[in-house]
Structure formats: structure tokens, C-alpha cells
């Protein structure tokens, strides 16, 4: 009987008995080798089949390069595998236990803390659940490398299986992201091993790689007599292994190792002059398996975690504006805030000083056509029964929301008027391109300021190096930078609301957005509730939302939600409503009717309203006043 017919019968038998598929060329070569080993003695077909199977068990399937698993199985995120597949285990690890404790156990090291702790480790109670084993297998059919996970306990598998063991997986096997979920009914151990894998995938070596321990490397250190003395690194008694301190030290030193196969090979055989060399052990050294040094860890990027929904989808400019607003509010708490300007000799300064008790303040910074800066600071004071509060200082033209930037000199128009035996100065400062930045909108306006004529004096100082102004304002004074009250349509700014310091609960409209949620959505007493922090770009405010708003966003009231749990379809709609509510809160930027309680420094959002053309017209009218 010729080799081809014997190979054909052996192939049929392997497939029928063991579901093993092999390439015909390998099978014929294997039969020829078996016949030569038996001195060309005629073997029966059964004997030949048995010896072929034994040779297959000892063969590295990577050498056969015979594909078995379906094409593209690693690219499919989720699926099911059907049929019979004879695969090879390259390595396996119990991932339910720490790799460090496993490797110390293999080396016979005692790592318990009984000698240094006051109490011995507490033994688990009989009724406590014991941690179950979970093996992670590295499998291959010779072409595809895939992982297998012990999804349910498989008694026939254990960590002592030698690398190269062949197993048969069969039946319906689910897989996720390149990992086969193995169960007892899906696995059969066929046996075998591969000598070439015994060292590379030894259990201790696999665990050592997991904890970042380097392979055995020979390093050379020169001495003072120009002789190179080789030193074997980490070559210890395999029964004991390195101590805990040495292992930790080796992990640090691993950052400085370099993986260069050529130079490493040379160091294994010669380490200096011919008359001063010491032979080194190299039985376990294989250049192709030297672990590359771990890259030095990059400093982790700082991340800001926002509560409940990650409502941080704002631009950098908005964030900077909010930060400046917070700083401005902190400055408002001071009663007296000096303004100090450092100037060069070539700057001209005009100071308008007046002498009442309380003040309204604004600062004008103008840029002339010749690019020289001219700073004009107006300080005004009005009598108001010793009641005063501090105004924020203007540090520079970029930080202040009270700044007016223009490209032409300011024209001053002084008009004197008599009213109730008191004469006021009206200073009207106009510019063709005056602009005022507030809430990220450029508001063109004329700044009109009323000051008293009595005791007024105007002085020009060209050689001044330091100017200090004391700024005060009364509780009832008008904020000239905004020129509005709490009920000016279409909305009011939160900073104006805070500065007015209302004595009782006040209901106003603001145009704001949610900065972050400060609490979870909850139901109590049959109503929805959630807390948040809102801002309009000038200030922050903690708010609660009324039940009606949340019910409209979710689409379900609390009683309806409880009722929907009995109906799967309704409950699914409720879950969709929750997701819609989350999206709406993230994108929420509209007019909010809020009820502000000054005693709690908190507000209740009563209604939401989109901005329409009427609001736009009201805003234009307010700006043109």
C-alpha cells in the first residue's frame, strides 16, 4: 500500500475519531518518518493511525499553518461558534488570583503577614462564597491566536497542563471580542505537549511577565583595573526565587534595561579581555525572548469629573468668563477697594474727583489713534445716609466688565442743571465704536453718569506714578454698567439680582444654562425633584426644579412611573423619557422664571421659556435707552 492511500485513510480516521484536520503534505511526511523509524516494517492501518495521532499531539500547530477557525472571528464583536475545532493551548493563567501570590507560591515563598500583624488572617466562614477559579487560555489553530475563558468551572482543565496541550472544543460556544466563553460541555482535553513551548510558556515565566518581572539578563560592570567582570542579574535558586525586596527592586530597575538582541548575545559569550573573563550561565537566556523595557509612565492628564450627566460641554471662553465672574463677586464683599495704576511718564491722566459720601463708579479705557493709552478714571460720590457697600476694582481693561474700548478719543460734554437747589454735572461720553461686553454679547451703548457739581474739581497730572481712588456705592444706587432693575424685560442678570440683596422672596426672569447637576433625580411624596447649579455668565446660583417641569421633560409623573412598572411597554417608554430628560438638561439654555429666596441663597425654577422675537425686541429697546 502506497503512502498516499495510507495518508488518505489516516486523514479520514483522524477526522472521524478526533475531529482533527491536518494538511496532506504534513500527513504524508509524517507517515514516511514513521516508516523509517520502524525500519520500513509494514504497520497495520490502525497502528499507523495511532502513531500519526501521537505525532500530531507533539507537533506545534503553528508549524502546520492549517487554518481551522472561521475567517474574521477576531473582528466580530459578538457571535456563536458551532462545530468541532482541535486547538492548541499555548499558555493558561488563573486570573481569579493575584499573579504575584501565584508566582511566590510556585517559588515556595511564604508571603503571609502572620508574623507582623496583631491577628492572624481570619478564615472565611463556611457559608461565605468561595472565590471561583477562572482560567484564561491562549489558544491557536496554527494561524489565529484567540483567547478562551473558563466561563463555568471546567474540572478537566488545570494550571499544570503543559504548553502545547491539544484540546477539542465543540458545540455552541459564545464569543465576545475575541474571547471564547467555555463551559464544561464544550471542552475535551486530547493531551500532548510541545517541547519548544515548555520554556517560553512555563507557568512561572508567564506569571513573571504579567507582573513586569524581566527575564534573566547578563549585565557587565567595569572595575578600576580596566577589567570587565560579568554579573548575572536575577539568577537565583529556582526553588527560592528572589525575595520580596529584590523583586520590587528589579521592577524599578526594569525601566533602565534595554532590549538589544545583538549586544545581549555578545555579552553572553565574551565580557572583556581574553585573560580576565568569567564564564556565565546562559542555559535559560534566549535573546529573542528578552522583554523590552517598559516605557516610562507619562504624567496622567488631570481630568475634571462632572456629576450626573457630565454637563461640561462648554467652550473655554465661557469657562473663563464664569471664573472671572466668581472673582468679581468675591471682590464685591470688600467695603473699600483701592484702584492703583502704575504708569509711565508719557501717559496722560485725567482724574475727576468729587466729594460726597457714597459712590457710583465706572472706568473708561480708550485707545487713541497713535496707540498711546489714555486712562480716565471717574470717581463719583453721593450722599446717602452713611449706607454704602464696596464696588469691585478695575484691574485692567481686559478683566473689567465695566470697561469701554474704543479707537478714538472720548468727547466730553458737560451740562449743568439745577434740581432742588442742588446742581449736578452730567457727563455724557460718546464714541462711534463704544462697546460693552456682558454675557458674551457686545452691547453698544452710551454711558451717562450723573455727578454733583458742588465741590467738583478737575485736575490734570502728567507726571503721576501712582493714583488711588476710594470707591463706594450705596445699596440703592443704580448700577451704571447695566442700567436696569430687577424687572427690566426681557430678563435680568444674576449678578444684578445678587447685588440688589432683596429682603424677601423675589421672582424674576433670567437667561441661564445648567452648569452641573448637584443631585440625583429623585421622587418623594409623589413629586420629582433635582438640584442643579445654573449660570448666565455673570454669576452662579443653586436651584431646584419644580415637579411640573420635570414631569414635562420626562413625560411621566411619579404616580404614572409607578404604574408603568406593571406594563413592560410603558416602562420602556418611561426609560426613554428619562434619557430624553437627560439630553434636554444638557442642552438647556433658555429663559427661566425663578423664585429667589435670599435667606437660603437658593432659587426654585418655576417655568422654562424659549427666547422669541419679542424678547429680542425688548432687549434692543433696553440697550437703546
From Swiss-Prot:
Keyword Endoplasmic reticulum found: no
Source organism, top-level taxon: Eukaryota
Main location per the UniProt record: nucleus
Residue list for modification Phosphoserine: 225, 284, 292
Entries under SMART domains matching the protein: DUF1767
Modified residues (N-acetylmethionine): 1
Disordered: region residues: 257-282
GO terms classed as biological process: DNA replication; double-strand break repair via homologous recombination; glucose homeostasis; multicellular organism growth; reduction of food intake in response to dietary excess; resolution of DNA recombination intermediates; resolution of meiotic recombination intermediates; response to glucose
Keywords of the record: Acetylation, DNA replication, Isopeptide bond, Nucleus, Phosphoprotein, Ubl conjugation
Location relative to the cell: Nucleus
Pfam family, one: RMI1_N_C
InterPro entries the UniProt entry points to: RMI1_C (IPR032199), RMI1_N (IPR049363), RMI1_N_C_sf (IPR042470), RMI1_N_N_sf (IPR044881), RMI1_OB (IPR013894)
Keyword Repeat: no
A GO cellular-component term linked to this record: RecQ family helicase-topoisomerase III complex
One Gene Ontology molecular-function label: nucleotide binding
Cross-link (Glycyl lysine isopeptide (Lys-Gly) (interchain with G-Cter in SUMO2)): 334, 387, 426
Family: Belongs to the RMI1 family.
Function: Essential component of the RMI complex, a complex that plays an important role in the processing of homologous recombination intermediates to limit DNA crossover formation in cells. Promotes TOP3A binding to double Holliday junctions (DHJ) and hence stimulates TOP3A-mediated dissolution. Required for BLM phosphorylation during mitosis. Within the BLM complex, required for BLM and TOP3A stability.
Quaternary data: Component of the RMI complex, containing at least TOP3A, RMI1 and RMI2. The RMI complex interacts with BLM. Directly interacts with RMI2 and TOP3A. May bind DHJ. Interacts (via N-terminal region) with BLM; the interaction is direct.
Protein's UniProt name: RecQ-mediated genome instability protein 1
Higher taxonomy: Eukaryota, Metazoa, Chordata, Craniata, Vertebrata
Gene assigned in the entry: RMI1
